[in-house]
Amino acid sequence: MHQPFFICIILLSSVIGNCQFYYDDSALVSGSSKYLVNFYNKTRHDFNVLYNGPFHYSYPLIKQGSPYFSGEAWQKGSVTYEDIVYDTVLMKYDLVKDQLIVMIGEKGHMPLELFSPRIKEFSYKDLKFIYIPRSSPLSLKEGFYQQLSNGKITALCKTENTLEEIIVEDRLEWKITQKKRYFIVDNNHSRTINRQKDLMEAVKDHRQQIINHLKEQKLKFKKNKEQVIAAATALYNKLERQSNE
């Protein structure tokens, strides 16, 4: 009478736990449950290193915003995990937990949370994110940063989402608030970019050319800080390469 409940407990503890072992008690499992276990074991065998982490539980219904960088849709990209590059991986970047979520299988069978310190970088579409470890000489908070440009200087953006409870017509609801911070890294030194003055100081070697370029592109710091920082640092790196040729 209590056997189905017992089977569910066994499955849950083996499948959505820390995912460190195979489930192999086939005597207790049959039908669709056995298919799920077989699928999980096969996938763990094929992708043992990457697909290794706790189960990712979905968030409550959120009225405003999304906890993920690119919304709820799964993105297909690549991730460098323990110095091995994995391509065509289904992923989401959770900005609330600052964690990369990967999906086993195309049909959404099992979302897992990867151990962040083992990830060097991940990317999808034209977006790239790098992991800054605690041991880094940079005075930056440990975690993932979007790489806006890369070269002699590197522009980074740190996006943090917070899940907040709100009361709407006597009902409890949730919303996302977002905070972005920008940095430029030069020679293992990080500089916080809050104002256009900070940006111009970071690119002072080519200041006038960059100012002219931003004017031509009609880019204004106050209206689109991220685009201006990306454009300015990309041009700076291009001019640096040209001067060294």
Place the predicted regions along the sequence by residue.
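Intrinsic-disorder/low-complexity, polar/charged segments
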Residues: 28-30, 195, 221-225
